[in-house]
Amino acid sequence: MIPFFGQSWSVFAPEPINGNFTLKVRAQTRQDGKDQTTDWVDATAVEVSLIKHNLFPPRAGIQAMELASEFKSNWDALSADHKVVVGLGYYVGTDWPIRLNKKLQSYGNPQAVAAYLESENTVIKYSTQVAKAIWGDSVVRVQFQIYRQNVVPFKDRKTPSPQPLQIANVGWRGLEIAPGQSDQDFADVFRKQYEKMR
């Protein structure tokens, strides 16, 4: 999908864009004092379904893909130690973002950490909207999974053996809401599209 919606010089480069990014979201909901983990929802597939067979596709149909692409680039720039920390759950209390930042900074490379945390924060806000759109106000925390799947090169098309998914593992996170964010407007569009796909 990316070559069609990421039209830039890189589409025609010697090594053109050759993979798809996916953003999946799941949540933990609390009912009667018990937490339950939901199934994964492929937010990218829901958004792409807005574009499919649509002569005038909305820009909303590529948000998850763009977020996933930027996030994966920033995640790739982290060290192995950083990635271990990112894979842990940070959601207890209101200071979990500060604790996560402090722990990541302790492993150095402050520029990569800052870029990563900025993209993670954006994806958490998006994941919060997705989770609330599907599971409502019982959502207490979210987890997202972002991965890239390379496309089989044209010369190897007759013997396809797709490379393994390049997964960015992230632990559970507390909910984040952007100022001015309308959960209701998002839910009206996203939930309707999600229900069509089921």
What does each of the following model-derived ranges do?
Residues 8, 24, 42, 141-145:
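Generic structural signal for residues positioned in beta-strands
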